Swiss-Prot record:
Domain HIT: 18-126
Primary location group: cytoplasm
Substrates-to-products reaction catalysed: adenosine 5'-phosphoramidate + H2O = AMP + NH4(+)
Outcome of swapping H114D: Nearly abolishes its ability to convert adenosine 5'-O-phosphorothioate into 5'-O-monophosphate
Residues bearing the modification Phosphoserine: S45, S72
Name of this protein: Adenosine 5'-monophosphoramidase HINT1
UniProt EC number: 3.9.1.-, 3.4.22.-
Lineage: superkingdom: Eukaryota
GO molecular function, one term: nucleotide binding
Modified-residue entries (N-acetylalanine), positions: A2
Catalytic residues identified in the record: H112
């Protein structure tokens, strides 16, 4: 977890990201779901027994940069996350998280929804 915080402290918006490369299939990912709006794939550094990301194909650097026109797309990410969680057998529950900015732990500046499950989540999360 400390590595992710360190990455977030130096990450900055702008330019291409690893997620853009995954969307364009330039680098491999364990894809769970894909449609014309988004892509869901397993996290390469899982923080729970099940940990996947749902990302929009449209580049939005962070939630604070989202526009009103992105409302439907952002809602779609949550619905896809819910469906993928069900497909992966997360019957007892799961957590959805979006990190915003360096203090929020955002290490990749392309909006992404984390879905974590397969164990009891702790509270508070931070």
């Amino acid at each position: 977890m400390a590595d992710e915080i360190a990455k977030a402290q130096v990450a900055r918006p702008g330019g291409d990201t690893i997620f853009g490369k995954i969307i364009r299939k330039e680098i491999p990912a364990k894809i769970i779901f894909e449609d014309d709006q988004c892509l869901a794939f397993h996290d390469i550094s899982p923080q729970a027994p099940t940990h996947f990301l749902v990302i929009p194909k449209k580049h939005i650097s962070q939630i604070s940069a989202a526009e009103d026109a992105d409302e439907s797309l952002l809602g779609h990410l949550m619905i896809v996350g819910k469906k993928c969680a069900a497909d992966l057998g997360l019957k007892k529950g799961y957590r959805m998280v979006v990190n915003e900015g360096s203090d929020g732990g955002q290490s990749v500046y392309h909006v992404h929804l984390h879905v974590l499950g397969g164990r009891q989540m702790n509270w508070p999360p931070g």
